[in-house]
Regions:
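FNR/FR-type flavoprotein reductase catalytic core
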Residues: 40-211
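Short, solvent-exposed loop/turn segments that connect beta-strands within catalytic domains
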Residues: 9-12, 28-29, 196-197, 228-233
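Short glycine/proline-enriched turns and hinge-like loops at secondary-structure junctions
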Residues: 12-14, 66-68, 215-216, 231-233
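Short, charged beta-turn/beta-strand-edge "cap" motif at the junction between a beta-strand
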Residues: 2-7, 58-63, 228
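Generic structural signal for buried aliphatic residues
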Residues: 1-3, 53-56, 221
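Ferredoxin-reductase
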Residues: 1-50
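Extracellular/mature segments of secreted proteins
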Residues: 247-248
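Local cysteine-cluster metal-coordination motifs and their immediate loop/turn environment
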Residues: 83, 178-179, 208-244
Length: 248
């Protein structure tokens, strides 16, 4: 509270926040995190100034699996791209090929373009706002519309050359809003079903409220799972492992 800003007689002290990690520079000793302003303590982050001390705990959760010698499709919506570009870079460093669908609501939302390009062999830039993004690399494509529509257009060869076919994909990782990930999960069994090979792994990063950040303590992050084959209903602590099977 000593360093917290004050407004009239109110101390604007922040509670603990669950943050999105973006990147790490080990040589310079830097950690980049992203705060999503959603009211309360997260809004106070905008009052921080360069040089203010910050206490970080973590990382919590589990590392995302980044196997080598596979073909992986990354599907990122908005803030999810801040996480996916580091995952994509790790996958490529391990020897995997990466097809990246990066989706945004508006043209002003895109950031870290160089990092996303470094995380992918091919990027499909998706934007709800026309005229869409101009690709920087010859192998990349652009699409005006939502990310599932972009995937359908790509799979149907409506975006030109298909550099990495869907049926080559061993793994799909989706990070974004609940609605976006649900739409991707539904499309895999609907309009895109014939384009994916049997047995591919599909992972979604669970969005849930966080509180203790100590793994399986407070149960604030409990999420319901329903097995699509048996109908069995279970719960998981998403703070322990944020990456779960997309179909559950």
């Amino acid at each position: 509270e000593t360093l917290a800003p004050r407004s009239s007689d109110t101390t604007l002290a922040m509670e603990g926040l669950a943050m999105t990690g973006a990147w790490v520079d080990r040589e310079l000793g830097l950690v980049s995190i992203i705060a999503l302003e959603m009211g309360g303590s997260s809004d106070i982050c905008q009052l921080m100034k360069p040089g203010d001390p910050v206490v970080l705990m973590g990382p919590t959760g589990m590392p995302t699996e980044t196997p080598g010698d596979q073909t992986v499709i990354l599907v990122g919506g908005g803030l999810g791209n801040a996480v996916l570009f580091s995952i994509g870079q790790a996958l490529r460093a391990a020897g995997s090929k990466v097809l990246y669908f990066a989706g945004y609501k508006s043209l002003a939302d895109r950031y870290h373009v160089d990092n996303i390009q470094a995380a992918s062999d091919m990027v499909i830039w998706c934007c709800d706002e026309a005229p869409g993004f101009e690709p920087n690399r010859p192998q990349d494509r652009t699409f005006v519309g939502n990310i599932v529509e972009a995937m359908q257009a790509y799979a149907s060869h409506n975006l030109g050359h298909v550099g990495i076919p869907f049926n080559d994909a061993d793994r799909l990782i989706a990070i974004g809003s609940d609605r976006m990930m649900a739409a991707v999960a539904h499309a895999r069994h609907g309009s895109l079903k014939n384009h994916f090979k049997e047995g591919h792994v599909a992972i979604g990063s669970i969005n849930s409220p966080m509180q203790c950040m100590m793994k399986e303590i407070c149960a604030q992050c409990l999420q319901r799972h329903i097995d699509p084959n048996t109908g069995e209903d279970t719960v998981v602590f998403s703070c322990f492992n944020q990456d779960q099977q997309l179909d559950h």
